[in-house]
Swiss-Prot record:
Description of activity control: Prematurely activated/folded staphopain A is inhibited by staphostatin A (ScpB), which is probably required to protect staphylococcal cytoplasmic proteins from degradation by ScpA.
Pro-sequence residue ranges: 26-214
Higher taxonomy: Bacteria, Bacillati, Bacillota, Bacilli, Bacillales
Pfam families cross-referenced by the UniProt entry: Peptidase_C47 (PF05543), Staphopain_pro (PF14731)
Class of enzymatic activity (EC top level): hydrolase
Reported modifications of this chain: Cleavage leads to the activation of ScpA probably by an auto-catalytic manner.
Domain of life, source organism: Bacteria
The protein's name: Staphopain A
Alphabetical list of InterPro entries matching this protein: Cystatin_sf (IPR046350), Papain-like_cys_pep_sf (IPR038765), Pept_his_AS (IPR025660), Peptidase_C47 (IPR008750), Staphopain_pro (IPR028076), Staphopain_pro_sf (IPR037155)
Length: 388
């Protein structure tokens, strides 16, 4: 399943040392947290629409709690850091607003991504969609006292420090364009570090909120034995990773691996033909049948209730997505796995998804069939295969 390469995207980060007392509003009492070091992010335009800020403040804790419960984390307190944007080298935003979610130790645990609705979005209740995942949180936490730039190319996300050395901090399985140079450099005279406005990502914008009540009351349902055992590298095997993860979960085993699945279905392919081969829905169904399952193809996104019932009955669901940005090239189609579902304390229904590119899960509005993924692309959930 293939797609084209996205253009380089840059997120310019400046880290500075600062001491700030932080109020912790837990159990109706204020508790001073430890002094925090701030991560400052360059932005071209700090203006964030009021409804975007309100949406993030209103809903972030419920979304975060659903992932905490999926990960079996203990109850905790969180707050939002200042929002930032991600920019291309032409200094234009990618259109999204990013809010870091801070724990009481001053580290970023999650990133809230709020995006304007795209044309093929099936939901219509709001101008924006909200998703939560770990995304770049680990990278932001590792460079608290340095000026850095974050870039992305066909191999993933890089941190470039003041000495101009680059370190790959987040891999994405994008195949390098044969026409592009192997080493891509920052355009001369257009360094995004020249952007002047900043937002302190690890500076809390409000009091810490405990998820104690939300944690106790919120409904979360998960495939009991779902684990991330492997992630997709530089290949076209997203369907193999998806099926392996689902079968390992529903059979409660560790024996399935993406490469072995792909080799079973394409035994005669070698070299790059094998490395970048994908699977059709028919091949996915056939493999499941050979493993004692009776999968069914559904030519649409599964509903929240369908996900809830199938997950309760230990039946996995594979997502078949078509890239909104381009129907051509590497990963124009993409497979992902449904991990479970949750009903937030505001009544919002979400589906928990695993993208084989990622080391964590993400939330998805159950009425929204367009899924934003970690490289900035969007996939329309057009079909499902269930019964793994």
């Amino acid at each position: 399943m293939k797609r084209n390469f996205p253009k380089l995207i840059a997120l310019s980060l400046i880290f500075s040392l600062s001491i700030t007392p932080i109020a912790n509003a837990e159990s109706n009492s204020n508790i001073k947290a430890k002094d925090k070091r701030h991560v400052q992010v360059n932005v071209e335009d700090k203006s964030v629409p009021t409804d975007v800020r309100n949406l993030a403040q209103k809903d972030y804790l419920s979304y975060v709690t659903s992932l905490d419960k999926i990960y079996n984390k203990e109850k905790a307190s969180y707050t939002l850091g200042e929002p930032f944007k991600i920019y291309k080298f032409n200094k234009k935003s990618d259109g999204n607003y990013y809010f870091p979610v801070l724990n009481t130790e001053g580290n970023i645990d999650y990133i809230v991504t709020i995006s304007p609705k795209v044309t093929k979005d099936s939901s219509s209740s709001s101008k924006y969609t909200i998703n939560v995942s770990s995304f770049l949180s680990k990278a932001l936490n590792e460079y608290k006292d340095q000026q850095i730039t974050i870039l992305t190319n066909s191999k993933g996300y890089y941190v470039v420090t003041q000495n101009h050395k680059a370190k790959l901090v987040l891999k994405t399985p994008r195949l390098e364009d044969k026409k592009a140079k192997k080493t891509e450099s920052i355009p001369t005279g257009n360094n995004v570090t020249q952007l002047k406005q900043k937002a302190s990502v690890t500076m809390p914008t409000s009091q810490f909120k405990s998820n104690n009540y939300t944690y106790n009351e919120q409904y979360v349902n998960k495939l009991e034995n779902f684990k991330i055992r492997e992630t997709q590298g530089n290949n076209g095997w997203c369907a193999g990773y998806t099926m392996s993860a689902l079968l390992n979960a529903t059979y409660n085993t560790n024996k399935y691996h993406a490469e072995a699945v792909m080799r079973f279905l394409h035994p005669n392919l070698q070299g790059q033909q094998f490395q970048f081969t994908g699977l059709t829905p028919r091949e996915m169904i056939y493999f499941e049948q050979t493993q004692g399952r009776s999968p069914q193809l559904l030519n649409r996104m599964t509903t929240y209730n369908e996900v809830d019932n199938l997950t309760k009955n230990n039946k996995g669901i594979a997502i078949l997505g078509s890239r909104v940005e381009s129907r051509n090239g590497m990963h124009a189609g993409h497979a992902m796995a449904v991990v479970g579902n949750a009903k937030l304390n505001n009544g919002q229904e979400v589906i928990i998804i695993w993208n084989p590119w990622d080391n964590g899960f993400m939330t998805q509005d159950a009425k929204n069939n367009v899924i934003p993924v970690s490289n900035g692309d969007h996939y329309q959930w057009y079909s499902s295969i269930y019964g793994y």
